[in-house]
């Protein structure tokens, strides 16, 4: 009787070990790679919901766009989860204030003759491994800077205008690389003797590569502003001053890393219908240019 009981106990022990071994084997061999990862996209610092209620978001995996939709700002402020494939490269772009008709599949475009929209954007790229949760902080960045033209000492009733030309006409999408093409815009009248025009960032705000630096130097070199004054006798505009805007910006040590770029101010000193000088002020740094003789166009 004791012998039988010992045999039974031994059999139970063997069976239990077999079940445990089988269970352990299934745990060890379980493949969790098909399970997706999740990326928590969060606006850092938080976005003011009074300024933006919703933003467009584009998600890319291994260079291929996976999804594009809009998301409420309050969700981005508290953390917005996006499914991502494991062992892939994840990219997310936020965008607001850009006309839909100016958006191509892989870049944002400013049609020639238009100023830059009051757009904002953010970008984040990261490798997704085998973990299940990742964190992507996104800082909303302004995609433009403002150029202001002011005139002093002008004759009553005279008119003037400013145009800005460059070779950056938008941004790569996703990401923050520059898109190169002809940019031409005329400053709009804000008030009497004051004109303003928005120009696109001339330097990307994230992940600047060596190739970008070379192109950025060329882009800044090409950025210029031209000022015209109306000749009342002829009834046409006379070109009075060419401003090497890009060179002045470059020499000033302008901080392109700021989320919101500082505006560039051009002050004209006038005498009757002639420009005596122009003072360009950038973040407290000034350059004074003498007025040209004037060429009627």
Briefly describe each language-model feature range.
Residues 1-24:
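Sec-dependent bacterial lipoprotein signal peptides
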Residues 18-46, 288:
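Bacterial Sec-dependent N-terminal signal peptides
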Residues 33-34, 136-144:
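Conserved "repeat-terminator" motif of extracellular CCP/Sushi domains
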Residues 257, 264-297:
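Eukaryotic extended interaction platforms
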């Amino acid at each position: 009787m004791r012998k039988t009981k010992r045999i039974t106990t031994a059999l139970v022990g063997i069976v239990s070990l077999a079940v445990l071994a089988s269970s352990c084997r299934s745990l060890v061999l379980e493949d969790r790679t098909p399970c997706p990862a999740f990326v928590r996209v969060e606006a850092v610092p938080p976005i003011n919901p009074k300024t933006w209620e919703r933003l467009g978001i584009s998600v890319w995996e291994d260079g291929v766009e996976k999804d594009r939709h809009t998301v409420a700002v309050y969700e981005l402020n508290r953390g917005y989860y996006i499914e991502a494939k494991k062992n892939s490269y994840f990219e997310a772009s936020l965008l607001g204030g850009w006309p839909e008709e100016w958006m191509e599949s892989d870049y944002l475009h400013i049609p020639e003759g238009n100023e830059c929209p009051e757009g904002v954007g953010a970008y984040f790229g990261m490798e997704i491994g085998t973990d299940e949760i990742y964190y992507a902080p996104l800082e909303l960045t302004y995609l433009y800077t403002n150029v202001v033209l002011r005139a002093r000492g002008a004759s009553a009733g005279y008119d003037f205008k400013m145009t800005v030309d460059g070779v950056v006409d938008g941004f790569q999408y996703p990401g923050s690389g520059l898109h190169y093409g002809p940019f031409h815009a005329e400053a709009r009248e804000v008030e009497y003797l004051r004109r303003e025009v928005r120009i696109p960032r001339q330097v990307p705000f994230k992940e600047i590569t060596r190739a970008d630096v070379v192109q950025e130097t060329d882009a800044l070199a090409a950025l210029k502003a031209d000022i015209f004054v109306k000749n009342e006798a002829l009834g046409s505009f006379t070109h009075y001053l060419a401003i090497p805007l890009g060179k002045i910006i470059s020499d000033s040590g302008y901080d392109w890393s700021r989320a919101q770029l500082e505006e560039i101010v051009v002050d004209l000193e006038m005498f009757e219908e002639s420009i005596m000088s122009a003072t360009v002020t950038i973040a407290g740094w000034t350059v004074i240019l003498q007025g040209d003789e004037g060429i009627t166009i």
